Amino acid sequence: MDPQAVFCPNEACPASGQIGKGNIGVHSLKERRYKCHVCGKTFAETKDTVFYRLRTVKDIVVIVVTLLAYGCPVQAIVMAFGLDERTVLSWQRRSGQHCQQVHEHLVEQPRDLGQVQADEIRVKMQGFIVWMAMAIQVGTRLWLGGVVSPQRDKHLMRALMERVRHCALSRALLFCVDGCEAYVDAIRKAFREPIPGPAGRPRLRPWDDILIAQVVKQYAQKRVIGVVRRVVQGTQAQIAALLQKTQGGGLINTAYMERLNATFRSRIAALVRRGRALARQIPTLHDGMYLVGTVYNFCTYHKSLRLPLYLPNDRRRWLRRTPAIAAGITDHRWTIEELLSFRVPPPPWQPPKRRGRPSNATKALIAQWCT
């Protein structure tokens, strides 16, 4: 147990979320509990992780979640480990919710995306159809998030573009999407900023250098007979420059997103085109999507991201990287246990709002923990 590597999870504590400040001590080695000397609260070592209040051995949980993240059927896990099916599904739900928190904390941070590709997957559920829309950063192969909705409409596209908006800096950005017209309106409405002005509602100004291109496939008898590439917003020269920067040139395409769709189809049984493993509820599919996507970002080496290391005598070694390493989020490949044990810090403490001047004790807390 290392008190210098943990933080207080109590949101009402002035020291919440701060590491290495000397406010955390070991409360019980036997029970694996820490104590915050500022608020006086104690908390377990596994607080805010997937393993919190689980009675099963951690290694078993890690193995089961790893199998779920790589497409192993739940029935096979039940037979192999002698677990209850409801237990396995609860671990999947808990892991998916935890991975979504990790994704929102680490991935949804402003960065120069360069080129983003988006696409949807038609998912057959038990008795109805849903759509799973996802996006990827081409340069680093980073999965930017996804949204599940019963309808393939403007609300689905806007929710996805809001996810992408949280990950983007105001830089030149190219969107490559399919022929769905809802994408164009969703991109234009998501990437706007309010401009302060006179009294009244501020005017929304679109971002500069937002480029939109569409790839429309033409079908005949369920076969692709042609591809039409359209420039919706921007110039051909601007798009060619971003294509050269992010993918080394080439034509307008959505191949990277389609390859990621194939990865998700191989790891989530409900996404198989013709199969019997149909999902029943949308939250189950949503949690599985975030589990697979976060494991893909942080725990999976991507062959196209490796870098050559040249050695003497004309020798060469390859430096393997995950999408999170390529994006600068982390410096090493995470294990599944490290991902499930990651603790998302709470929001920064805010001093209480009271009438009058703050007391000297409140001023001391603000000076110590808010500066």
Show where each model-derived region lies:
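Residue-level recognition of single "structural anchor" positions
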Residues: 1-371
